[in-house]
UniProtKB/Swiss-Prot annotation:
It is found in: Nucleus. It comes from Candida albicans (strain SC5314 / ATCC MYA-2876) (Yeast). Residues 183-204, 437-461 have a biased composition (Basic and acidic residues). Residues 161-210, 435-488, 722-760 are annotated as: Disordered. GO terms for biological process: mRNA processing; response to xenobiotic stimulus; termination of RNA polymerase II transcription. Residues 161-182, 462-483 have a biased composition (Acidic residues). Pfam families: Beta-prop_RSE1_1st, CPSF_A. This is Protein CFT1. InterPro entries: Beta-prop_RSE1/DDB1/CPSF1_1st, Cleavage/polyA-sp_fac_asu_C, RSE1/DDB1/CFT1/CPSF1, WD40/YVTN_repeat-like_dom_sf. RNA-binding component of the cleavage and polyadenylation factor (CPF) complex, which plays a key role in polyadenylation-dependent pre-mRNA 3'-end formation and cooperates with cleavage factors including the CFIA complex and NAB4/CFIB. Involved in poly(A) site recognition. May be involved in coupling transcription termination and mRNA 3'-end formation. Keywords: mRNA processing, Nucleus, RNA-binding. One of its GO terms (cellular component) is nucleus. Its main location: nucleus.
Length: 1420
């Protein structure tokens, strides 16, 4: 019984599109990262200038989908002609149409179209990823294509009366033309299937008397061969631009041709353009072109002004205009070898371009098409235009100086945004945001922009004014476009880099290492000592990075302090450090500038504990708050006045100061607000609304906010009457009341539009209070007795709205401990306001403030770290008081610090949602901002051992993801990573591409080489071994391997080394001990493969290195280690895997695995085993060994050292294609987690006592679990329960974390895994009782909760898995990502679901389980 948890989100951008999704005037960037859908907007930075504008991408929101995104398309529908809807295609053959709900500030599912059963029933092939295409001119039809099966979904379009008359005339003419109709019987059958397999959702109807009219028709499925009898195997299919009817271009092949049989057959590709008649489901052939080169595999439709299509092959480009005229370009010298019609090609073979996996981007309103190779080089495909006809096409190299800051590696889709900006999805590196700028004089550039603006204005005017003459508009538009083309044709382009999205993929390997081994920093224990970090690779070639993923933030500590007894501290204006001893009721002043010398002040209250210290007027005045007194001092601590008369006999619990406003909370449940005038040294009391006189107040906050901006001007927004309700529904609905008249008029007159932006007003001073019954109340300074509350905040509902305050108070049971309403962000953007709520159980809830077009609302952030639990389910988490501390500037971030036994830091970057990071493995009791000569905008925090550390937030880490990450550029692709613990270094096996010299074993050229293409050789690889120092993450030594040699696998092992003694096992009981009395030493073992062409055998070498200490170079303390070669041996067959086994090492070479013993004079083979194909994975656990084979599945082998032998224990009978594997240990149960090449995790169990296992010889498949990305690597890690890890400090009797690493040996082991899209996950064992609770809860969440895009979580995880064993998935692996959604539901919903799980006490048990799952990676 196990659970799966994804603890780092995917980051590789696979799909992207730019569209008017939220605003009709501004394009949004929408990206798909595996299962993560993100919506961005472009913002202009404050430091921008007219000549040098600077833009950034800002995340609006993200949504985790229950499926893998395979395509994104924007569509403009009759429901809302002002905004785009989004078509989200997910694996394997389904797509959802979604829109933006402005009122709820989230996506809304319009419809789900499901074709998987239909397609699977129509083909014998296993269903794989399908392709979604959309008609681009009128958005009249979409097509989901799986090979030759086409699923068409027609859409209704906005048509004019003239268009309808022309269509009627065309229909009459079409009756006399020959058409290829689809069989009527099949048509009816497909129509019935499409109706049963299409799910429509409509939640936003505004009409009550009639059903809303759908904007799409029934879908139908046909085979591509019915479009035209000449079509055989479809290679690619796309819709073309600027046709009045839906027109498709189809690439197809009639016979299989490849490079090996070109002598026998060439030019097998056919290109055909067809016009679709969606009503009759028939086609009309426009033109057909035969005998195209075999490796043409892509169609690129070109928009106006170029039109036509580009056909892309590996070795050529072909342009086909709308009349079927071809213009061909040969881009390398292979073209003459692969086609019989080379004479018709324009020869630009000297460019030597390789067009595999290139990106082709038509630049908007330009005569050039941008061609980006997979290596990142830019080229222009230039079209010489003569009016609307194309005279000539040629390819030009783009000067590298114009894009020197833009690095691309395997570029993918390109999204076109506003202001000539392009976003390029980069598969093997970061995805950049670039801007196309015309480099001529400002006059030329202005002319171009002004003309384009005029064209856009005319288009807008034509849409708004029905009385305009359309023909006259088109005439002027064409003239202006021609003028613009002339201007553009004379200009040069440069590409400006603005921003990029970080890509942590493809992550092919990782290891676990310690990044901070210093026991002490600044004379205090290092808070990050022995923390286990994840070291992974990302990117390829020049964009390769080494990622250091740490479990906590790594603060840069500059100095430290030690106290005898302190509970709280405050830094005042970088001059004074105030401390409060709550135990002895004492407060002290320390002067920072005088080496923290104590300062005596006769006015300062030092015989009481201090609740809070505040600064006023930029530190010129200081305010001290104690339980009984409030005193204002000058900056020399001379008393100016007190507020003691206001308090009388009451007791102060807490206080808040913002600007000149002071808010204090009393033990009686009252609150007082004062405005302090430091100029006159006086104060005034601000009266709170009288409605709150009888209300118990527990806490509150003072802020500058937009929250009450709308209701302060128009309180009618809160009136609950039918008129305003209907008005709001109409305004935010995607359907209009005028749809019913569209059949008669043929025109759409929808009332929907994007809501207006927030009014441009200044923030107002807002007082926020929390009542005893957990309501949040807000009012302005000049409130006029008006008071508002956030409805249902005590239930933590998904959205919070303002309402009038209800004076009727519920039962007083306060569980909200503290709140904040502040901006969060980084140096690029701090506009977003968040309401942060801390509960007494340590939970943190965050709500984002947004404007829906009428009023301000709050929306809950759902993807936050779980920090606490209700009902005392996590008492350890609150063993030290949790408090929120706001930092307006923490090294560039506006952030919130959370004190406690597990301290947290809340950060938000411009590219991410708010992230809650664990700050340290040690507790933080108090914290304050701090700056001095060493650090700027840092902090000082106090731990529970009375030690204070002054530190700053390191900016060389990235805080966009769930854990802090540091990226180190390597520059060469990484194959394997190892951490050498003894020397505290990291060893990398890297490789780079080199030209391949095709020689045989004797060094002679191999027969069959074509001499004419020597300047374009094939590529091979050259490996190297690099030693990296964590001191500054630089490469300190490199070992270059021979050409064609790559270090396939590399591991750090602790091996037994030494000579055998002469003793034998006899009467002497100590003889066996003597024989194996060897020294243990850590070595680096490298397995190398020598890879050449298929005619030559792949041999291998294994090498053993020791990392030794040396004297470092002057000024380079990191260079204190180097490699020392111990042994090497060549093998027959490449070495594909190595691992440590009981003090020895195993090498898989070819079809054999050999265990070797390391001795003083070399290595000795001691055991071997033959394998079927080759070993793709080998892992050990004690004397147990996993061997993974790509065809024959997984073996479990035992190793015995006396005598040396390898014993086959069990085999997998399903023949899983093993990519990687590792052990999961659940006390005395042994499991093997195996990842195959279909993105599926298989849990195998070795259980000799189970009769089905046949004495253990058969590994039982207990569960299978599908992931949304390819699994690349698995590593085992001890699992320590959070409750078992809690220890109690003997002096303070406070719960503290255990020493790191734990001294106890765990009987439980989990597995951490990486994927190609940059995400990381762990699979961990759980006990029977927790499994039952969580399984029932998971089923309830699947069935009862709403899922984005209408997707099914159950189908996502096990839908495509073929079960070959009756026992498989009787206890499936739990999806913790789904279960943790429980924590973000409203309180009523949570308790309702908990009651369905079990009876009494189940709510607390569920929370305990969730906390245990959330802390499974505590051993990092």
């Amino acid at each position: 019984m196990d659970a799966y948890r994804e603890f780092i989100d995917p980051s590789k951008v696979n799909n992207c599109v730019g569209c008017n999704f939220i605003s009709s005037t501004k394009k949004n960037l929408i990206v798909g990262k595996g299962s993560l859908l993100q919506i961005f907007e472009t913002i202009q930075l404050k430091q921008s200038t007219i000549n040098k504008p600077q833009y950034r991408l800002k995340l609006i929101d993200q949504f985790k989908l229950q499926g893998t995104i395979t395509d994104l398309k924007s569509i403009r529908t009759i429901e809302n002609p002002n905004l785009d809807y989004l078509m989200v295609s997910t694996k394997y053959a389904k797509f959802s149409i979604i829109k933006w709900d402005h009122h709820l500030n989230t996506i809304a599912t319009v419809s789900l179209h499901y074709y998987e059963h239909c397609i699977q029933n129509s083909t014998f092939e296993k269903l794989a990823v399908s392709e979604l295409i959309l008609e681009p001119t009128y958005n009249s039809v979409s097509c989901l294509r799986f090979k030759n099966l086409l699923c068409f979904l027609p859409f209704e379009v906005i048509e004019d009366d003239e268009d309808e008359e022309e269509e009627e005339e065309e229909d009459e003419e079409d009756e006399d033309e020959g058409e290829e109709n689809i069989d009527d019987t099949k048509e009816k059958k497909d129509k019935k299937q499409s109706k049963t397999d299409t799910i429509e959702e409509d939640k936003n109807s505004t009409t009550t008397n009639q059903e809303p009219r759908l904007f799409y028709d029934s879908s139908f499925i046909i085979d591509a061969t019915t479009l035209d009898s000449s079509i055989d195997t479809v290679v690619d299919m796309q819709f073309l631009h600027n046709y009045r009817e839906p027109t498709i271009a189809v690439l197809s092949s009639k016979q299989e041709v490849w490079a090996g049989n070109l002598i026998k057959s060439k030019d097998n590709i056919q290109f055909q353009v067809l016009t679709l008649d969606l009503n009759l489901k028939s086609t009309i052939s426009v033109f057909k072109i035969d005998n195209l080169p075999y490796e043409i595999d892509r169609i690129i439709p070109l928009p106006s002004p170029l039109n036509g299509t580009l056909l892309v092959g590996c070795n050529e480009l072909i342009h086909v205009d709308n009349g079927g005229v071809l213009k061909r370009i040969a881009v390398n010298k292979f073209t003459r070898l692969i086609t019989a019609s080379f004479k018709s090609f324009q020869d630009q073979s000297d460019l030597n371009l390789k067009l595999e996996n290139c990106s082709v981007v038509p630049i908007p309103d330009d005569h050039r098409v941008l061609l980006i190779l997979q290596t990142g080089e830019f080229y222009f495909i230039n079209f010489e235009l003569d009016g609307k006809s194309i005279k000539r096409i040629h390819i030009d190299n783009v000067d590298k100086k114009t894009y020197d800051k833009i690095q691309l590696n395997h570029p993918g889709e390109v999204a076109i945004l506003d202001k000539n900006m392009l976003f390029i999805a980069n598969s093997n590196g970061n995805s950049p945001l670039i801007q196309v700028r015309y480099r001529d004089s400002s006059k030329t550039s202005d002319t171009k922009e002004s003309k384009l603006n005029k064209i856009e204005e005319k288009e807008d005017n034509k849409d708004d004014d029905d009385n305009d003459d359309d023909d006259e508009d088109d005439l002027y538009k064409e003239e202006e476009e021609e003028e613009t083309q002339k201007t553009i044709s004379k200009s040069h382009i440069e590409f400006l880099y603005h921003d990029e999205l970080i890509n942590n993929g493809p992550s092919s390997t990782f290891t676990l290492g310690i990044c901070s081994k210093e026991k002490f920093k600044c004379n205090l224990p290092n808070p990050n000592y022995n923390e286990v970090s994840i070291l992974s690779n990302a990117g390829t070639d020049s964009q390769t990075k080494l990622n250091i993923i740490t479990p906590t933030i790594q603060p840069s500590i500059s100095s430290s302090l030690t106290f005898s007894q302190v509970n709280r501290m405050w830094n005042l204006n970088q001059k004074y450090l105030i401390t409060s001893d709550d135990v002895n009721y004492k407060s002290e002043i320390f002067q920072i500038e005088k080496s923290y010398a104590r300062m005596k002040s006769k006015h300062f209250i030092n015989n009481e504990l201090t609740i809070n210290m505040h600064e006023l007027n930029n530190g010129k005045f200081i305010l001290q708050v104690t339980p009984k007194q409030i005193v204002l001092y000058d900056n020399k601590f001379k008393k100016r006045f007190t507020l003691n008369d206001e308090i009388k006999d009451d007791e102060i619990l807490s206080s808040i100061l913002r600007d000149e406003f002071l808010m204090i909370f009393l033990a009686s449940g009252d609150v007082m607000i004062f405005v302090i005038n430091t100029y006159n040294e006086s104060y005034d009391k601000i009266e709170i609304p009288k409605l709150l006189d009888d209300t118990i107040i527990t806490t509150g906050y003072i802020t500058n906010s937009y929250l009450l901006s709308a209701v302060s001007k128009n309180v009618n927004l809160l009136l609950d009457n039918n008129t305003s309700s209907n008005k709001r529904k109409r305004k935010h609905s995607a359907l209009s009341n005028s749809e019913g008249s569209k059949k008669n008029t043929g025109k759409s007159q929808p009332s929907t539009a994007a809501p207006p932006p927030p009014p441009k007003v200044n923030k107002v001073k807002t007082f926020v209070l929390v009542t005893g019954d957990n309501r949040i109340v807000a009012f302005n300074r000049f409130h006029g007795e008006k008071c508002y509350q956030l409805n249902h905040v005590d239930k933590f509902t998904e959205n919070l709205s303002l309402g009038f305050f209800d004076p009727n108070q519920s039962t007083v049971d306060p569980f909200i401990k503290q709140i904040m309403l502040n901006e969060l962000g980084d140096k690029f953007d701090t506009k977003d306001e968040y309401l942060t709520i801390l509960t007494i159980g340590g939970e943190i809830y965050m709500y984002k403030l947004y404007f829906d077009g009428e009023n301000y609302f709050f929306k809950k952030e759902k993807d936050l770290t779980i920090t606490g639990a209700p009902d005392n389910a996590f008492p350890y988490g609150t063993s030290i008081e949790r408090r929120l501390v706001y930092f307006p500037n923490l090294n560039g971030f506006t952030s919130i610090f959370v004190t406690g036994v597990i301290p947290y830091l809340i950060l938000k970057t411009v590219h991410s949602i708010p992230r809650i990071f664990q700050f340290s493995k040690i507790a933080a009791m108090s914290i304050s901002a701090f700056s001095d000569s060493k650090i700027k905008n840092g902090l000082i925090f106090l731990d529970n051992q009375q030690n204070a550390r002054i530190c700053e937030l390191p900016l060389d880490f990235n805080y966009e993801f769930n854990l802090p990450m540091k990226h180190v550029d390597i520059g060469e692709s990484i194959k394997s990573i190892a951490y050498h613990e003894t020397s505290d270094t990291v060893v990398l096996s890297t490789f780079k591409q080199i030209p391949y010299d095709c020689l045989d074993e004797e060094g002679k050229p191999i027969a069959g080489i074509i001499k004419d293409i020597k300047d374009t050789p094939a590529m091979s690889f050259k490996g190297s071994i690099k030693l990296v120092s964590p001191y500054n993450w630089t490469v300190i030594e490199t070992i270059e391997l021979e050409d064609n040699e790559v270090g396939m696998t590399l591991k750090s092992m602790i091996l037994d080394v030494g000579s055998e003694s002469g003793s034998t096992l006899g009467s002497d009981p100590n003889s066996l001990i003597k024989k194996y009395n060897k020294k243990k030493r850590e070595y680096i073992v490298i397995g190398i493969g020598k890879y050449r062409m298929e005619d030559l055998a792949a041999n291998g070498i294994f090498k053993i290195y020791e990392i030794i200490d040396i004297i470092p170079e002057p000024g380079k303390p990191e260079t204190n280690h180097k490699f020392k070669e111990i042994f090497k041996e060549e093998t027959r067959g490449a070495i594909t895997s190595i691992c440590e086994l009981s003090g020895r090492f195993l090498v898989s070479q070819g079809q054999k695995v050999i265990v070797r013993d390391l001795q003083d004079d070399g290595t000795v083979p001691v055991a071997f085993l033959d394998t079927p194909v080759y070993v793709s994975e080998s892992k050990s656990f004690g004397n147990l060994l996993i061997l993974g084979d790509p065809l024959k599945g997984c073996w479990l082998v035992g190793f015995d050292a006396e005598p040396f032998r390898m014993i086959m224990l069990g085999k997998d009978t399903q023949h899983i294609s093993v990519e990687c594997a590792d052990f999961i240990i659940n006390d005395d149960e042994i499991f093997v987690l195996v990842a195959d090449n279909n993105n599926v995790l298989h849990l195998l169990n070795y259980d000799p006592d189970d009769p089905q296992s046949i004495n253990g010889t058969k590994l039982l498949t207990k569960a299978s679990f599908e992931l949304n990305s390819t699994i690349s690597c698995l590593r085992s890690l001890p699992l320590i329960d959070i409750e078992e890890s809690v220890q109690t400090d003997a002096l303070t009797n406070i719960a503290v974390p255990p020493p790191l690493p734990p001294n106890t040996t765990s009987n439980y082991f989990q597995v951490i895994g990486s994927t190609q899209d940059g995400s990381f996950f762990n699979v961990f064992p759980i006990n029977e009782a927790a499994y039952r609770r969580m399984y029932i809860l998971q089923q309830q969440l699947i069935d009862k909760e709403f899922h984005y895009c209408g997707l099914n979580p159950r189908l996502n995880r096990i839908g495509s898995i073929k079960l070959q064993n009756n026992e498989t998935n009787t206890k499936p692996i739990l999806d913790y990502d789904l279960i943790r959604r429980f924590t973000k539901l409203s309180d009523d919903r949570k308790r309702n679901l908990a009651n369905k799980v079990s009876g009494k006490g189940i709510y607390q048990d569920i929370w305990k389980d969730i906390i245990r799952f959330e802390h499974t990676l505590n051993d990092l």
